[in-house]
């Protein structure tokens, strides 16, 4: 039997009378790349927020790594890296300082790892530049660095 990294059954999200996500069923296998496509307002971001436990489903099931996401939320979500539409970096801190905060919150601060991910996303030479002075592309790459810094099993972009 295949163990899915993500599996949803009839995942639904309502905001009052409005249905933002209606009975989404998906099965995502480990090592695969999937895309969630749709028009504006189709519920893509809402679905991602439910998968990341940032928003609770109105009904339906979410299984992560083969079990109900509510059973071991801290354990399961430590295996996930994500990039949300507006990353929450501190404007007056540089790239290293911002990543250091994230690493410490996750309990895995390692300066060498920070340097490695900054190099990987081509921000090593800008590591002491303040976030507010980054271009949009640099901000997005810092978001990628933050998402991959702890070597997640699942990356949601």
Predicted segment positions?
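Walker A (P-loop) phosphate-binding loop of ABC-type ATPase nucleotide-binding domains
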Residues: 39-43
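Conserved ABC transporter NBD signature motif
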Residues: 60-71, 75-76
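Conserved ABC ATPase "signature" region
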Residues: 100, 104, 111-126
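Hydrophobic anchor residue at the start of the ABC signature
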Residues: 144
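Catalytic Walker B motif of ABC-type/P-loop ATPase nucleotide-binding domains
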Residues: 155-157
């Amino acid at each position: 039997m295949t163990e899915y990294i993500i599996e949803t059954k009839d995942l639904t999200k309502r905001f009052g009378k409005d249905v933002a996500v209606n009975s989404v069923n998906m099965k995502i296998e480990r090592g695969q790349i999937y895309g969630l496509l749709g028009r504006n307002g189709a519920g893509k971001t809402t679905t991602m927020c439910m998968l990341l436990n940032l928003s609770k489903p109105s009904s339906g099931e979410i299984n992560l790594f083969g079990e109900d996401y509510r059973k071991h939320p801290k354990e399961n979500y430590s295996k996930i890296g994500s990039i949300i539409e507006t990353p929450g970096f501190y404007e007056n801190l540089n790239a290293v300082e911002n990543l250091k905060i994230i690493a410490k919150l996750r309990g895995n601060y390692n300066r060498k790892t920070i340097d490695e991910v900054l190099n990987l996303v081509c921000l090593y030479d800008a590591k002491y530049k303040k976030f507010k002075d980054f271009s949009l592309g640099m901000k997005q790459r810092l978001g990628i660095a933050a998402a991959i810094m702890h070597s997640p099993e699942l990356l949601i972009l």
